[in-house]
Amino acid sequence: MTEQGPATHIEDPSCAVAHGAVPPPVRERTLVAVFASPVARYLLQYGQDLGFHPILVEPDADRRAAFCQGQSPFRDAEFLKAVPELDGSADLVATDHHRPELGLQLRDALRTEARWIGVLGNPRHPGPHIEMLRELGVADPEVARVHRPVGLNIGSRTPPEIAIATLAGLLADRNDRPGGFEF
């Protein structure tokens, strides 16, 4: 109640989510994590919560089995040996830049129509994927499609923090926003 009369609530569609009305995703989204790792686990788990269809690509059968072992938090996830055919709804993140299969996995990803391809790694060091891809005969314009670093610069140190920063960066890019605190 105010001095002028009863307080009224003004309906604003931008507040719908805060009040429990969750709209369906605007379009199908796929998130591919290449290589089983702690970051991949959080990336796919949080990504699924954000409406992405989760896919893990792990060429090593033992690592793939270990990742899938036990209680899986993933619904309808795919666990594959190689990068599948991807369309423009897919974002792919290589979660281990030390793996010898990195170049081959990225080359295969670059042959798809994936919307976004990135490799985790410290931005102060050159990405090993560049030389790997060149040795495989991948042209420089294609190599340049691979983003590194990935995610927003929030000082991430732990696997969950890295996953959050990565997903925030992907969402900002998908929504044509710079990320950060400016609205």
For each feature predicted by the language model, list its residue ranges:
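Segments forming oxygen-rich coordination pockets for charged ligands
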Residues: 1-72, 91, 125, 169-183
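Adenosine-phosphate binding glycine-rich loop
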Residues: 120-183
